[in-house]
UniProtKB/Swiss-Prot annotation:
Function: Catalyzes the NAD-dependent reduction of succinylglutamate semialdehyde into succinylglutamate.
Family, per entry: Belongs to the aldehyde dehydrogenase family. AstD subfamily.
GO molecular function, one term: succinylglutamate-semialdehyde dehydrogenase activity
Protein residues bound to NAD(+): G234, S235, A236, H237, T238, G239
Gene label: astD
Keyword NAD: yes
CDD domains: ALDH_SGSD_AstD
Active-site feature positions: E257, C291
Record keyword NAD present: yes
Name of the protein in its database record: N-succinylglutamate 5-semialdehyde dehydrogenase
Keywords of the record: Arginine metabolism, NAD, Oxidoreductase
Amino acid sequence: MSQHVMFNAVLSSHPALFIQGEWRIGNGVSFEKQDPMSQQRLWQARAADHTDVTLACHAARAAFPAWARASLEQRATVIQQFAALLEQHKQSLARTISLETSKPYWETLTEVQAMIGKVAISLQAYQTRTGHSQTPMGDSMSVLRHRPHGVLAVFGPYNFPGHLPNGHIVPALLAGNTVVFKPSELTPWTAEETVKLWQQAGIPDGVLNLVQGGRETGEALAAQPDIDGLLFTGSAHTGYHLHRQLAGQPEKMLALEMGGNNALIVEQVKDRDAVVNLAIQSPFISAGQRCTCSRRLLVKTGAEGDAFLLRFTAVAQALRIGRWDEQPAPFMGAVISSQAAERMLAAQQHLLLLGGESLLNMTRPDSQSALLTPGIIDITNISEVPDEEYFGPLVSVIRYTDFTEALKIANQTRFGLAVGLVSEDRQQFEQLLLEARAGIVNWNKPLTGASSAAPFGGVGASGNHRPSAFYAADYCAWPMASLECEHLTLPATLSPGISFDLPKV
């Protein structure tokens, strides 16, 4: 707790921007981060204004040639040193993430471990997806190489403030790009501590730059002529805004990883508690603040489905919630802010007014805290269900009669991130694979389960395909194809119409 108290003493003028290898005080407005549980101030500094953002982009541009020309081994050495420092500082960084996000400590430890694992996976992805290959073609060689874009802007989210931006920063740097990192204004402290580790790892000046702030800072960064691409993780609302802002600029690479209105289909309930455990993990892990969380729980009508829902509701009601460091450890903490808590309660009320039936009422035990209890609402009888991602611990139940109807309901969304099936019928899963409009399709596993060794992303309003996890490498380098021949000789057979049977000049 001493770390928490010490940080409260930091003045608003503390240097929270990292530009050209130096920590600087921003020229923008002062903003702060509060503990979601206690509303106590954790962090305060000044945001980056347009001048700061321009300076960061210029620094990244100036640093690009040398970093891009460095060997892969040289770049990998710095990145591997960063991973080693993450290992050394795993507990302190996990505590920082817990304080900012309210996620339990056991969960944030796994987040930092995922950051460490991302380095080895990114090296593998670089070689597999964007490496160097040669194909003989007679007297020549077809060679495929990949080149970095240049300056990439990375926009990070608040739900995984360490792991998700790390999943773009690491492959971007490995490919030879330089980066301007703009984290969520709701998790500035995690970003600052992470960049300090990059500095200790020996990242060259200007290769990685940090600009802090909210919407104004983000818009200034997206509008910079000096960026060659933008990698974004966050809400569909913000992603759409960035897409419009960069419209008409096809020369800039835009990678959007957004949210989902994901469906989990409970078709069979053989082991009731095993199914309930999976169904609890899917909507309520991280207080429902994962893009892959199930927002819709599709349950087959009948006695088996009724019994499952009763057990599911009882287990959800008994979930331990609380502060990140409480013992025994809680399953989930608060949502990210009081404003987020208010939005979730408003969403629940809206669904009830539309005709939904509350199976478990989501509540806010303390009006001064962003802590919410899990909520379950049956929306089967709502004629026009809002196609929204409610980013918190609220799941909507929809009853269905047969599997064909379940598939139809699952696809009734503009999003296309994740869908899951609980069933022991392999043929049903094969049918789901054929008909699902989603980038992630899980079978008898929580929707929130995903592998960094696989592509991650969705279609529709969930983003432009796979800008995260293993395929992030694709967005960090562009392919360069070459036909190469060391010695030029006249072909034995000439093209029709060409003759060299001419008088010598």
